[in-house]
Every structure is written in C-alpha cells, then in structure tokens.
A protein has these predicted regions:
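Single conserved hydrophobic/aromatic residue that forms the stacking wall/gate
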Residues: 184-192
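Non-catalytic accessory regions flanking glycosidase/transglycosidase catalytic cores in CAZymes
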Residues: 1-183
Length: 192
C-alpha cells in the first residue's frame, strides 16, 4: 500500500479561493423548485411567483452561482418546453423522478430568479436524452443578440437582451440507476 502525506500551512498561500466553489444547484425534485423557490399565488411570493423568504436567504448566504437545471432532471430536460407563455407550455412525465413536470418554472424564470438572488447562472445542457445540436440551440437562445431563430424566439418571449450566460455544464453524472440516458455511459466523455 502506498501512503501519502499532506501538510497544510495556513501561512503558505497559493492564491485566493474562487468563490464559485460555494455555488449550488436547483433541481426539479420534491419541493425544491415548486414551493421552494417558486410558488405562484402565495402571499410569500413576489409578482413573479418567486418565494421572497428563499430569495432573502440565498442573498444572505451570498450564493455566487447556481446551476440549472441541476441533478438528474437535466438528463430529460427539454428546455423548449420551459420557455414562452406558461399557458402554452406542455406538461410531461419527468423520467428521473417519476412525476409530472408542468414547466411553469423554466429557463427564463430561473435567469430572472438568479438575478434577483444575486447569483450567476451556470446552465446545464441535457446530454442524457439529447446532444450537441440541442446544446447549440440552447446557447443560441440564451446568448445570441438576435437575427437567428432561437435568439428571435427569446425576444418574442419578452427577453430583448441576451441572458449572457458565461458558464455551462455538460450534463450530469450518468452512472446510477435513476439516471436517464439514450446512450451508453462510456460514450458520454466523447459526447462532451
């Protein structure tokens, strides 16, 4: 057996710790999104349906960055279902957690929520049931100024300016029984 030793010296500084290490994620699991950060019509919520008490706590914690959609949910996420008029968004089976996803809280709501929380956005790309073409379309919707199909669609949804998302996450871990994927685990590295 090989042994190793680590010596920690608080006076030997290499550099500052990147504050993003204290980031978080939000997943459509249980009551994390619906009732946790979003509860339309509640006296605890603001005009967009965002829970004011949760926003206050996230601001107080100074969460620097939040990944969305987090966890296993991203592996079945159809971002197009989560944008546009809420009355036109489809409800679909959510495959990782076995519930119905109403898409009433989606991509644009998350960006708005993050801005109110004072957190940067890390957008996750579905590599479980989708792939590079979908990632390109999502990037176009979020970050292109205009003049393309998806950037103009974002504008039609009421977001004239790009979301300007700087950090992206390629999928989620794909090695457990509750992970949803259309490809072998070994192919995810190549896909990424």
């Amino acid at each position: 057996m090989k042994k190793a030793q680590i010596i920690v010296d608080k006076y030997f500084l290499i550099g500052k710790t990147d504050k993003r290490i204290y980031g978080s994620f939000i997943e459509h699991l249980g009551r994390a999104v619906y009732e946790g950060i979003y509860q339309e019509g509640s006296p605890l919520s603001d005009e967009q349906g965002f829970r004011k008490d949760t926003l206050e706590l996230v601001r107080e914690l100074q969460v620097p960055i939040v990944r969305y959609p987090g966890g296993n949910f991203v592996s079945g996420f159809r971002w197009e279902d989560s944008v546009g008029p809420k009355t036109q968004r489809p409800s679909r089976p959510e495959l990782a957690w076995g519930v119905i996803e109403t898409n009433q809280f989606g991509l644009n709501e998350f960006v708005d929520w993050s801005r109110k929380a004072g957190s940067d956005v890390m957008m996750a790309v579905n590599l479980g049931t989708r792939g590079p073409e979908d990632a390109k379309n999502l990037l176009e919707y979020c970050n292109f100024k205009g003049g393309t199909y998806y950037s103009d669609l974002r504008k039609a949804h009421g977001y004239e300016q790009p979301h300007d998302i700087k950090l992206w996450c390629l999928g989620n871990e794909m090695d457990g029984p509750d992970r949803k994927s259309t490809r072998l685990n070994s192919s995810h590295g190549k896909l990424s």
